[in-house]
Amino acid sequence: NFLIELQSRDGTHHYARLRVPHNIPRFFFVTSEGDEMEADDPLGNRRIDVVPTEEIIGEFLPLLFPGYQVVSKGMFRITRNTDVEIEEDEADDLLEAVRDSVTRRQWGGVVRLETEHGMPSNLTEFIIQKMKLKPFQVYSVKGPMAFAGYMALNDLDYPKLKDTPYFASFNPDTQPVDKLFENIAKRDILLYHPYQTFTSVVDLVQQAAKDPAVLGIKMTLYRVGNNSPIVKALMEARQRGKQVTAVVELKARFDEERNINWAEEMERQGVNVVYGFVGLKVHAKLCLVIRKEASGIRSYVHIGTGNYNPGSAKNYTDLGLLTSAQDICSDVTDLFNVMTGYAVRDNYRRLFVSPTCMRSGIERAIRAEIERHKREGNGRIVLKCNQLVDPDMIRLLYEASIAGVKVDCLVRGICCLKTGIKGISDNITVRAILGKFLEHARVYWFGPLEDTEKSLC
C-alpha cells in the first residue's frame, strides 16, 4: 500500500491510499545486451535489472492524481489476525460457516503495521490513528517488504545460480503400476518422499479408480492443492460405479476456499463427502481401498505423514506406508467409520489416534522403555517431529533421561525441551535438520535401533 499526502490547488491537504494490485508481476525485468561482464560471471553475457513494481508506481504517482501536488508518500503493509472463530456447534451448515469465516478473515483485527523506513511521521501517525493501533504494533522496515514475492526471482533462467534439480526414484516394489496391489499384498512398502516419488501414491488411487475389482475407496483430504490428480481419480472412481467417500477438512488453514470448491465438485460427481468433526480437525492422511479378490474381500491402505499433494511432496520429507496387513486395515476401516459418524471407538489394534489414544499410547511406550532400561540397560528413544511443546510429554522425557535412557530428538520447529540440565536432561540430544527439503515426517522409536520390532511411525 501507498499512503500519499496531496495538496489541492486551493492549498488544502488530503490523504489517499493506493493499493498495489495483486494481479500484476511483483518485478519488471529489464535486459541490457552487450554490457561488459566478467568472463567467469555465472549470468553469462547478459545483465538484467530487477525493478520492483512498487518503485515504478511510486515514481509515477503524480500521473495518478492530476490537479494535485504530491507532498509526501510512503509505503506500508498491514498484517491482520487470520484466526477467525467458527461457531461450529451453532452452524446449521458447516460449509457455509467456513465460507463465511474466509470472507471475514480479510477484515480481521490489525496485529502489525509495517512502514517504509524514513516514512514521514505525519503519514505514520495518520495510519495509527485511523486503525487505533498501539506503538508496539508499528515496525519501521529497512529494505523491501513482503519478501514472499521475491520467490519470483527464482523464475529467472540462471541454472548456475540454482540448486541442481533433484529427481526422485521409484520404489521398485511399486513397479509395474498394474501389479501394485499384488505387490502390496506380498509385503508392506515404505515410501520416503521426496527421495522416492509421490507418484506411487497417485498411482494407487488412479489404479483403484480403474480397477474393476475395486469396490470402494475412502480417503481423507486436508491440503490437496490445485488441479489435484488424486481428487480427479476419486471422481473418476465414482463415475465408474465405485463407492467413494472423501473426508474433507474444511478448516485447513488458508486452504478453506480450495477445499470448499473441491468438496462441492466431488458432491456434484456423486462422491460421498464428509466434513469431519465439530471442534476437531481431521489431520490424518489415510486412504483405504476395498477390493474383491478370488480369496474374498481384501483391503489396502496408505498411511502417510504428508498431505495428498504432489506439489508439496516434492519439497517436504514425508513417510508413507502401503500395506494390506489385516490388523492395520481393520483399524483404518474402524477409524473411517468413526469419521463418517457410524461408530465410536477409543482404542485400536495398531494405530495411535488422537485425541482418544495417541497421548496415552506414546506415554505407555516411554514408560515401558524406562522399565526396560532398568532391566537391560540399553534404553533408547528417538523422536522426530515438527514441534515439541507439550509440558507433560517433556516432563516424561526428562524422567526417561534421569533413568538413563538415551533420548534423541529431531525437532524441525519450536522445541521447549531444554538440554544440558545437569541430572535432568544429560541424556537428551536435540537437533534440527536444515537442508534442501522441509522436514515433515514424524517418527517415534522406542528401543535399541537394531530392534525393529520396537518402532512406531
Give the label of every model feature segment.
Residues 1-381, 399, 403, 415-439, ...:
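N-terminal localization/anchoring segments of enzymes in phospholipid and broader phosphate metabolism
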Residues 386:
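Cofactor-pocket helix-loop regions in the catalytic cores of large enzyme subunits
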Residues 406-410:
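Hydrophobic alpha/beta core scaffold segments
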